[in-house]
């Protein structure tokens, strides 16, 4: 056993842990039930747009997987779902819909009353995202991220007993008063210069790693096909397409369909698969 290699690995893991947690403090934040106030600060990594959209897969691997599409790379699951839809088979179309990546949005926020903890990443879905975009498009609200003349965002969050679902629901509204991020120049500078980057926070899997997770999900060791996580999400690509055609019952298992679509010996059907 190489003790030097073990020490190097330990140091690497500790460094990664410190980077992700920020000295033991989570870099992520989410609103709790009740009323809170935050300030969305200018995005250090994209000066013109404060929000970062990312694609994730839930329930396919042992952990949530960030899609390679987030880094502009080919995604085997996305290619697979395209082939499923193109087949015109109802079962395939349904499977493709369940396999689709879910969109999550991240915003850099300074939580009022917790400014000393620095900027956090707030993750939310389509409804809150649209509310923020609508506010930005409202001339009476304007740029609420402006350093000196922006607006705090007031949040009201209700729990499952109100929503009737297992999830909380948060509504947003702008403060009527314009204000700076902070009267403390150190807080302002730290908020602008020290921000976690969503793209760097999540593990970047290779094409082959994602493909292996998909194959394991479709053909687990026990012989039974896996189940997709029931992660709540709202699709970002509009209404689902229903104009597929049915050509009889297809008894091919999901695993066999996966093999067929990744088979180098199949006839050329004009698809865009890179393998």
Positions of predicted regions on the chain:
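OB-fold ssDNA-binding interfaces and closely related basic DNA-contact patches used
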Residues: 1-143, 204-208
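Acidic, gly/ser/pro-rich intrinsically disordered tails
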Residues: 202-275
